Amino acid sequence: CERHDHDTLYKLLPKDGSVKLNPITTRLGVLVLAGPNSRKVLQKLTSTDLSNEAFPWLSGQAISVGHTSCHALRVNFVGELGFEFHHPIEQQVALFDLLMEAGREFGIKPYGIKAMSSLSIEKSYRLVPRELSIEYSAYESGLDRFVHPNKGEFLGRDALVAGREKGLNWNFVTMEVHGVSDADSDTRG
C-alpha cells in the first residue's frame, strides 16, 4: 500500500520540481482506541470536545492526548466507536501506556492487526490490500457512498463514470457463515 501510494504520488509531481515528496512513515506512529467506551477513555486525557457534533465520524483534528500532540481521526476499522492517533513515533510507548491506564476502569485490552482485520470483515469494512486494489473500481468495491463524481474533476473520474455506465464486472458483498464455532481468524487465509 505504501509503495503503491508513493509511486502514484511520485508520478503526479510537477516536472518543474516545485513540489517535493517527503515520506514520513518512519517518523510517525499510529495507535487506535476503539470500543463502546473509547470516547470516555479519551475524554479523560484531552480537553477537546469529543461529541458527535464537534468531532463527527470521518473527521480529523489536531488534539493533545496527555502531553502528546496527535492528529486524531474519528475512524477505525473494527466497527465500533473509535479514534486513530497519528503521533511522533518517539511518543508511542508513553501514549500507549497513558491510554491503557485511562482505560483500566473500562476493562481496556490491546488488540493486534489480525484481530482488527477479522473485525473489519465482520463490519464489512474493506481494506487495502485485502479487498481494495487498483484492480477493482470504487463502485465494484462497494464504496459508492464515498464517490461523488458530480463534485468536480479528480484523477480517474471519467474512467470511473464510464465503467459504472457500462456495468460492473464485480460486486463485493459481505457473507455471513452460520454453524461454524471454531474457525481460524486469519483473514489472509
Task: Identify what each model region corresponds to.
Residues C1-G189:
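Conserved, structured C-terminal
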